[in-house]
């Protein structure tokens, strides 16, 4: 008989619902714990997205920035652990991870649905498909660019960009007063960062050029996507 991992007869297949937790190895327990924690953070991330849609000022909260960075770290850690430890999984471990993966996929579908609703809302308000599809594409490119510059200022610019994206939309660009308010806000945060005692001169010089670049890109996004009604509190 050929060796196989399949059970052709249902009465001979192991029942995962009656499996004992003690059968899991320490490696499996660690992986399942981290994956479950990652799924919980994904759910909290979706809830924060929904709250920030209703209250854009939440994007300035340090809790939000810390949660997003921690969520990104666990994403990479989960992938690394999966590639390293997955071959040693038993049947019970695979069954548990299948349920967790299903939950994660469901959460990602919710996030995609929220983005689709925002797109439909923007299309309904502007009446232009080009404007509606332009905003998400430009902000995704901005997000990828900022991920390559892991500085506090870059994170700040990303949060301000999200405020533009989640704010009210209309068919006119940002006013000069709104651009001035944005510049004051960004420069104020940047001044506090560059005066930090733990910041080296080399990092300040390198990040200074990055700051000017991101400020230019952010203003271009605001004008290019024709966003308005941004509230600065």
UniProtKB/Swiss-Prot annotation:
Keywords: Host Golgi apparatus, Host membrane, Membrane, Transmembrane, Transmembrane helix, Viral envelope protein, Viral matrix protein, Virion. Homomultimer. Interacts with envelope E protein in the budding compartment of the host cell, which is located between endoplasmic reticulum and the Golgi complex. Forms a complex with HE and S proteins. Interacts with nucleocapsid N protein. This interaction probably participates in RNA packaging into the virus. Residues 53-69, 115-233 are intravirion. InterPro entries: M_Torovirus. It comes from the Viruses. The keyword tRNA-binding does not apply. GO terms for molecular function: structural constituent of virion. It holds the Pfam family DUF2632. It is found in: Virion membrane; Host Golgi apparatus membrane. The chain crosses the membrane at residues 32-52, 70-90, 94-114. Component of the viral envelope that plays a central role in virus morphogenesis and assembly via its interactions with other viral proteins. The lineage of its organism: Viruses, Riboviria, Orthornavirae, Pisuviricota, Pisoniviricetes. It is a multi-pass membrane protein. Residues 1-31, 91-93 are virion surface. GO terms for cellular component: host cell Golgi membrane; membrane; viral envelope; virion membrane. This is Membrane protein.
């Amino acid at each position: 008989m050929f060796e196989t991992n399949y059970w052709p007869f249902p009465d001979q297949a192991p029942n995962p619902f009656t499996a004992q937790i003690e059968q899991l190895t320490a490696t499996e327990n660690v992986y399942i714990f981290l994956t479950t924690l990652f799924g919980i953070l994904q759910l909290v991330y979706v809830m924060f997205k929904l709250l920030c849609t209703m209250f854009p000022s939440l994007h300035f909260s340090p809790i939000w920035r810390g949660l997003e960075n921690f969520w990104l770290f666990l994403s990479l850690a989960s992938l690394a652990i999966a590639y390293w430890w997955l071959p040693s999984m038993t049947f019970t471990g695979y069954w548990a991870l299948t349920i967790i993966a299903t939950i994660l996929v469901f959460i990602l579908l919710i996030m995609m649905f929220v983005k689709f609703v925002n797109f439909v809302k923007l299309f309904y308000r502007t009446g232009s498909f080009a404007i509606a599809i332009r905003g998400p594409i430009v902000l995704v490119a901005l997000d990828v660019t900022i991920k390559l510059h892991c500085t506090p200022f870059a994170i700040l610019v990303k949060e301000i960009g999200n405020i533009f994206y989640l704010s009210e939309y209309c068919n006119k660009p940002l006013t000069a007063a709104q651009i001035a308010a944005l510049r004051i806000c960004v420069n104020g945060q940047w001044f506090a960062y560059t005066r930090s005692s733990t910041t080296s001169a080399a990092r300040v010089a390198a990040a200074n050029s990055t700051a000017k670049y991101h400020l230019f890109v952010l203003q271009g996004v605001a004008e290019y996507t024709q966003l308005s009604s941004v509230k600065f509190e």
